[in-house]
Amino acid sequence: MTAHEVNFDGLVGLTHHYAGLSFGNEASTRHRFQVSNPRLAVKQGLLKMKALADAGFPQAVIPPHERPFIPALRQLGFTGSDEQILDKVARQAPRWLSSVSSASPMWVANAATVCPSADALDGKVHLTVANLNNKFHRALEAPVTEALLRAIFRDESQFSVHSALPQVALLGDEGAANHNRLGGEYGSAGVQLFVYGREEENEIRPARYPARQSREASEAVARLNQVNPQQVIFAQQNPEVIDQGVFHNDVIAVSNRQVLFCHEAAFARQKVLINQLRTCVDGFMAIEVPAGEVSVSDAVATYLFNSQLLSRDDGSMLLVLPRECQDHVGVWRYLNKLVAEDNPISAMQVFDLRESMANGGGPACLRLRVVLTEEERRAVNPAVMMNDALFTALNSWADRYYRDRLTAADLADPLLLREGREALDMLTHLLDLGSVYPFQQTGAADG
């Protein structure tokens, strides 16, 4: 059956700031306390979406979350009105305020893991929400992510949205950032590659930075998504690269159809994995980048592999890259050599995503890939699909509500909370989502 890959990109939230919350993500740590520009950040993301949509790649949007997230502060024992809580936490525990104000839901590669209908035992599209258990600020996301996905993928005859796994370290799940699908045509059955960093009975794990994804979680997600057991491979990421800042697999590898583009040091037992994929995937091609041409540290600094690999109508592929790749002499030299060689990657497109990149999120972090047949695509909430009208509406919306400068101190401003809620309220109408946010369900603006 004919199907296409639709990229659902996360909209950057109004509280986008640099707090260094993500240990193991070196860009996040390096840019801690810098001044951010939320309006520029959301517009950089929108420009990428629109440019790719105009080039014929189907695009859709996933909204940001409610931030600062007052219910989490109440769980932590802060009391009073919303404004009083903001004041208390800013004075007593500013780190918590930063955590509950994180705009990290914009990186929707961590929102869920997707199984196309061609791979599922029941013939439906499955999405399992990620629990993001390793980081407090990200573990807050799952309930609202689930509500948003249910508002986008409403038709239960076509889509199954599964709640996140239990919030325990044993089942740490980071979503599609640790998942690749390989195969031929999108509408044909493919091979799903789940990548993990640790497993309970295995002592091979990183020493410096945490391995966020467990094998146990990957196996559970594959079961929930009803992936045909004959079409699944579980592979361990090289713990040495996790210790060099590769906190998700999509920082060191990206796949599309029959191509796996990765660093030569991406996986533990990489040769075994490559041979396994060669056996399972017709026409499989591994493009392994040698350390002599691009080191792991340069790959992390430029987010070479946090790129999008997109299929064009003629069968060739486009590599969507952050500007940091173009700015790095060695990486850019390698890329120009790559597109000149005999392989499906024949073109590159560079985007300025510096606001997201400074927090450790490149083009691939910002998107969730969902393979859909024409019938399934018609069943998606049409209001989230990117087109000229939505692009114009979202830019006007961002101009109205987003600040062009934000510091950690600004997070305590009760006006920011009010602006955010008003913006999201308008967005839910614009995208026909219903009342997906807790503040809408309580009906209280002041707690």
Curated annotation (Swiss-Prot):
Keyword DNA damage: no
GO biological process: arginine catabolic process to glutamate; arginine catabolic process to succinate
Keyword Hydrolase found: yes
EC number assigned by the record: 3.5.3.23
Catalytic machinery residues: 174, 248, 365 (nucleophile)
GO function terms (MF aspect): N-succinylarginine dihydrolase activity
Catalytic reactions on record: N(2)-succinyl-L-arginine + 2 H2O + 2 H(+) = N(2)-succinyl-L-ornithine + 2 NH4(+) + CO2
Gene3D superfamilies assigned to the protein according to its UniProt record, in alphabetical order: Succinylarginine dihydrolase
Pathway listed: Amino-acid degradation; L-arginine degradation via AST pathway; L-glutamate and succinate from L-arginine: step 2/5
Chain residues that bind substrate: 19-28, 110, 137-138, 212, 250, 359
InterPro entries (alphabetical): AstB_sf, SuccinylArg_d-Hdrlase_AstB
UniProt keywords, alphabetically: Arginine metabolism, Hydrolase
Subunit structure: Homodimer.
Entry similarity comment: Belongs to the succinylarginine dihydrolase family.
Its job: Catalyzes the hydrolysis of N(2)-succinylarginine into N(2)-succinylornithine, ammonia and CO(2).
Stated name of the protein: N-succinylarginine dihydrolase
Organism encoding this protein: Salmonella schwarzengrund (strain CVM19633)
